[in-house]
């Protein structure tokens, strides 16, 4: 597991360039057949890919500047202006966002008739693009304010879209941006697939209030269409990650309204994700069974209520459109019988995280000996500490149990690095599980500590910043991972012969 933002690059964050190709080559040589990424959507001000202005658009900061040069749209001096001279170990979203936007606007001025034709074809096959491009064009005109603070003629979607031709030129730029994003990503994905590596993507369940999805589809959300008042917002109650719960603040879907048109927005969204990736992990899957609704004025997620989700009414429609859809259900956190039943009814694999299993006082479903075959087993997710960081921060009782369970008998459990003996024992324990798929973050392949953690749920600052270098990737003990992938029979192909 390694997100694009965390890849090595010369541009402040990872981009779709030769460094990603190199990473794919390395993991393929080690026998890995799955590569998991975080959501590709544009990010919010806290740099979170889970709170986006669009459920369909891609984040333009991942566009490779040199790729624009290779398309003949900019000169060498232009793309080199995007080169970053700061630390290679931290993603600089502010730098990348500013520089990439400037470069894309310059490139847009140089598109020719053939490229314009290709962009038009892209637009025709992506129905979401018109609303998104108008939304972004108007947002720029409104000085990037949230849409509910726009002037009346813009804030109301149906009034704004009547005058769509007045935004044609400025909207055309955003169509171009998405065309380039998907062109570059599709080339990367095709290469990964050719190397036998399938991409597991991530789809957030909720969208941001300040998003094209809410602006253009108000009746789909529990929002007063006249006052724009939101009574309840999304979150989760207190859990492993946070004693106050997590107050996400996203608007909540009006499932009854969505059912009336056979969940068409969700069918489109899931279909889009299935084209973007080979397999889709749906974040916070439990909300389809029941979801935590928090009063909009609340400062924490402690106070709320469980409300019914659409359950199989939605997924019956999904299966009608996409039989055998390759979906992973992120089923972590607090859940009850309704979530268990929904998992059984859909047949989707759930998730196991070994760190959650190291409770000496219970026989957790996350402990590897309780793993079921139809599951994905993680050393840790993007929301977890690194495994070395966890060992250092765990209670003495938890750490003793974890090390004993994994068969580690030495006294150097705190030793990190590429050959960390304690990390290897835990990795091997996950690899021995009966779960069909086992996944590890790059940080844990390297034996990094908690300073390399990707995200701390409930903490708004300094997340999503981890970056690696080419040297780090090259220093990973490839022979070790190739050995355990072979030893524990995890080198099976991600694609069958028919797909190849």
List each language-model region with its residue ranges.
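Outer-envelope exported proteins of Gram-negative bacteria
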Residues: 38, 198-200, 204, 279, ...
């Amino acid at each position: 597991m390694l997100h694009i933002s965390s890849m090595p690059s010369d541009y402040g964050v990872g981009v779709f360039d030769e460094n990603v190709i190199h990473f794919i080559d390395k993991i393929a040589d080690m026998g890995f057949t799955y590569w998991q990424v975080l959501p590709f959507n544009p990010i919010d001000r806290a740099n979170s890919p889970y709170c986006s202005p669009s459920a369909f658009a891609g984040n333009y900061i991942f566009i490779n500047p040199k790729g624009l040069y290779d398309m003949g749209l900019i000169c060498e001096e232009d793309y080199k202006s995007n080169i970053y001279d700061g630390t290679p170990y931290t993603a600089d979203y502010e730098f990348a966002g500013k520089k990439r936007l400037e470069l894309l606007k310059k490139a847009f001025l140089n598109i020719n008739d053939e490229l314009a034709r290709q962009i038009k074809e892209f637009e025709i096959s992506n129905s979401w693009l018109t609303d998104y491009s108008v939304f972004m064009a108007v947002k720029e005109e409104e000085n990037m304010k949230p849409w509910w603070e726009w002037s009346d003629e813009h804030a109301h979607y149906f009034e704004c879209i009547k005058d769509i031709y007045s935004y044609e030129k400025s909207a055309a730029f955003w169509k171009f941006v998405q065309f380039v994003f998907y062109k570059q990503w599709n080339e990367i994905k095709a290469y990964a697939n050719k190397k036998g590596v399938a991409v597991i993507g991530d789809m957030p369940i909720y969208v941001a209030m300040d998003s094209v999805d809410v602006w253009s589809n108000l009746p789909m959300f529990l929002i007063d269409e006249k006052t724009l008042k939101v009574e309840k917002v999304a979150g989760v109650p207190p859990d492993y990650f946070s004693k106050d719960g997590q107050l996400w603040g996203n608007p909540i879907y009006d499932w009854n309204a969505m059912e009336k048109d056979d969940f068409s927005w969700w069918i489109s969204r899931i279909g889009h994700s299935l084209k973007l990736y080979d397999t889709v992990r749906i974040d916070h899957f439990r909300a389809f069974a029941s979801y935590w609704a928090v009063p909009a004025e609340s400062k924490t997620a402690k106070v709320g209520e469980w409300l019914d989700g659409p359950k199989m009414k939605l997924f019956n429609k999904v299966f009608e459109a996409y039989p055998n859809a390759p979906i992973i259900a992120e089923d972590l956190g607090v859940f009850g019988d309704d979530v268990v039943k929904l998992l059984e009814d859909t047949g989707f694999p759930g998730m196991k995280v070994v760190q959650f299993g190291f409770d000496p006082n219970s026989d957790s479903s996350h402990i590897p000996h309780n793993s079921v075959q139809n599951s994905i087993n993680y050393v840790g997710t993007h929301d977890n500490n690194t495994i070395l960081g966890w060992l250092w921060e765990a209670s003495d009782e938890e750490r003793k149990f974890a090390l004993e369970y994994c068969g580690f008998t030495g006294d150097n459990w705190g030793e990190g690095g590429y050959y960390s003996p304690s990390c290897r024992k835990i990795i091997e324990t996950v690899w021995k599980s009966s779960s069909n798929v086992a996944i590890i973050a790059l940080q844990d392949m390297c034996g990094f500590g908690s300073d390399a953690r990707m995200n701390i749920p409930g903490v708004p600052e300094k997340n999503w910043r981890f970056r690696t270098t080419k040297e780090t990737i090259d220093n990973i003990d490839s022979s070790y991972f190739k050995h355990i992938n072979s030893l524990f029979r995890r080198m099976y192909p991600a694609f069958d012969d028919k797909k190849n």
